[in-house]
Amino acid sequence: LSTLSLAIPAVGIGMAVQDTGTPYVVFVILALLCGLGGGAFASSMANIGFFFPKAQKGNALALNAGFGNLGVSVLQFTAPLVTGIALFTPLFGAPQTYLENGVQHQVWLQNAGFVWVPFILAAAVAAWVGMNDIASAKASFADQAVIFKRKHNWLMCWLYIGTFGSFIGFAAGFPLLMKGQFPDVDPSKYVFFGPLVGALARPVGGWLSD
């Protein structure tokens, strides 16, 4: 269900970017809904450790996190490709136009959201049918709420905000940095390399921790 819920912001973003009059608050709400994916990612990090012995937990966590971070690179690689073609026209909106050096260009920004919907639906069906849930790991909210009283939990949360939050921030800022420092270079062709290197490096950290 958490995977399926990601279809809401994917469709919402595809609709919102077609109207230049869309209020900023709408994009804030859509961004918050995208956080449902972050919640699924966090739960998978807690879940994957049950499938590996203690001596391999670091590598398991790193591989799982690396695959999650890889999504940033996949998005930055895919979005420039799909927004440049009439992938869903005329079903899901007309292209937007802009002028560059006196030449009119067309772009389909909505494709960056709509393109993920089939994959989200397929993943949701696969999870519903074949996910290996761990019955012994179930606990009530009261059982889980004990973590709020543990100082190490707060320390690790703060540390995680600094590390994973920095990764997301650097991935978002990299295109702007390239555009500002190298104005003659098209950043859309290279920005995916930044998060790609970060994602591929995570398994190394897991191996070292083991």
List each language-model region with its residue ranges.
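Helix-to-loop junctions at the C-terminal end of transmembrane segments
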Residues: L1, A201-D210
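C-terminal ends and interior cores of transmembrane alpha-helices
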Residues: L4-T20
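Hydrophobic core of transmembrane alpha-helices in multi-pass small-molecule transporters
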Residues: P9, P23-G39
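Glycine-rich segments within core transmembrane alpha-helices of 12-TM secondary carriers
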Residues: G38, G58-G84
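Intracellular juxtamembrane helix-capping segments at the cytosolic ends
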Residues: G39-P53
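C-terminal membrane-cytosol helix-exit motif in multi-pass small-molecule transporters
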Residues: G84, V117-A137
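Juxtamembrane intracellular "pre-TM" segments in multi-pass secondary transporters
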Residues: N132-C157
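Extracytoplasmic gate region of multi-pass secondary transporters
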Residues: K151-G205
